[in-house]
């Protein structure tokens, strides 16, 4: 099992870009507003679904979002998390008003669309839902959390690769202006450290940080890049502090706030200064990345980095269970 997992994780450039234009049953080239790339949504139990629909189905969308239209949606969605289930009827009505057809199964959905947004707020059914999309050979964006466990996240990426289906997953916080600038525009020179924070409310059915902590952890990894070697976790009744040590000796921290009203952000420290992240800037920057992914079928994020993010969170849980001892990420990635 270790050798199988190790060989998969090393093949980072192949995942998400395995399928060529000619191998898919449609072309994403030359699409216009009159002949758009048809998007299907799985899961109307999250505010992300109507938010993305409004962006793509706008009368005059941003140029980067032009040539797409959300045409169909399968509402479910969590059937066990009450706070998610209760939102489904209202979000059904919202997307119907934007011209979206509601369908009764994922199998029906994939027959009507070119690409898929897997938006189900509950990460537990993502593996089963993604398998139906992979079978249909449709490029797919999977919203956070990519799955309800690291094990399922790894299976999703491996099965996407085996099926030759492009996919990627991300929190919208990765694409805040300053976060993106630190990573891609050398805004503060080499990043020496980062302190990130976000709400970290709990959902008992998910590993601790997977539910909302993912947002702040994704900020941390966007700034620091991959290569975290170990984590140590410290807990109080009101917050969680996870200290990560990178292979080059740099230190990055994530602070998750359990209660109260807290924003998403952090501070990155570089050789040319420091930069503050936050507040949340909405879903449009992520939608633009999704649109580019649907056109090119190339993930903007190395799959190994996404898997490392989930290994970081699972290692943080293990550290907490063991009273705050240091836990190596490779004990998760290669177990």
Predicted regions mapped to residue ranges:
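A general structural signal for well-ordered alpha-helical segments in protein cores
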Residues: 49, 153, 179, 216-217, ...
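N-terminal glycine-/serine-/threonine-rich beta1-alpha1-beta2 phosphate-ribose binding loop
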Residues: 2-136, 161-162, 322, 329, ...
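Aromatic/hydrophobic pocket-lining residues that form π-stacking "cages" and hydrophobic walls in ligand
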Residues: 129, 156, 182, 315-316
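Hydrophobic residues in well-ordered beta-strands that form the structural core
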Residues: 104, 142, 167-169
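A contiguous active-site-proximal alpha/beta segment in oxidoreductase catalytic domains
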Residues: 146-206
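C-terminal active-site/capping subdomain that shapes the small-molecule cofactor and substrate pocket
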Residues: 265-335
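Rossmann-like dinucleotide-binding domain that binds NAD(P)(H)
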Residues: 194-261, 304-311
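Short helix/strand-capping hinge loops at secondary-structure junctions
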Residues: 137-139, 144-145
């Amino acid at each position: 099992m270790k050798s199988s997992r190790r060989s998969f994780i090393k093949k980072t450039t192949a995942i998400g870009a395995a399928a060529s234009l000619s191998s898919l049953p449609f072309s994403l080239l030359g699409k216009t507003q009159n002949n758009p790339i048809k998007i299907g949504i799985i899961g109307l139990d999250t505010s992300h679904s109507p938010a993305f629909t409004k962006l793509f189905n706008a009368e005059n969308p941003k140029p980067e979002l032009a040539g797409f239209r959300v045409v169909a949606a399968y509402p479910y969605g969590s059937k066990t998390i009450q706070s998610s289930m209760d939102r489904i009827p209202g979000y059904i009505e919202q997307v119907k008003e934007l011209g979206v057809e509601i369908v009764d199964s994922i199998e029906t959905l994939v027959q009507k669309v070119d690409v898929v947004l897997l938006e189900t707020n509950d990460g537990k059914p993502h593996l089963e839902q993604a398998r139906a999309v992979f079978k249909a050979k449709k490029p797919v964006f999977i919203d956070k959390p990519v799955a309800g466990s690291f094990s399922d996240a790894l299976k999703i990426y491996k099965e996407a690769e085996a099926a030759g289906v492009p996919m990627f997953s991300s929190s919208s916080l990765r694409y805040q202006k300053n976060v993106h600038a630190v990573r891609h525009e050398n805004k503060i020179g080499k990043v020496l450290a980062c302190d990130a924070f976000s709400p970290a409310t709990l959902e008992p059915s998910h590993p601790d940080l997977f539910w909302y902590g993912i947002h702040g952890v994704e900020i941390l990894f966007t700034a620091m890049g991959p290569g975290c070697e170990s984590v140590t976790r410290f807990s109080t009744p009101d917050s969680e502090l996870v200290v990560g040590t990178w292979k080059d000796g740099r230190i990055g921290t994530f602070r998750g706030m359990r209660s109260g009203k807290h924003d998403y952000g952090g501070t990155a420290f570089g050789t040319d200064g420091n930069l503050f992240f936050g507040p949340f800037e909405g879903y449009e920057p992520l939608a633009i990345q999704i649109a580019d992914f649907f056109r090119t079928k190339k993930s903007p994020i190395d799959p190994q980095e996404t898997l490392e993010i989930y290994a970081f969170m699972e290692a943080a849980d293990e550290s907490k269970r063991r009273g705050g001892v240091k836990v190596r990420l490779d004990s998760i990635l290669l177990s």
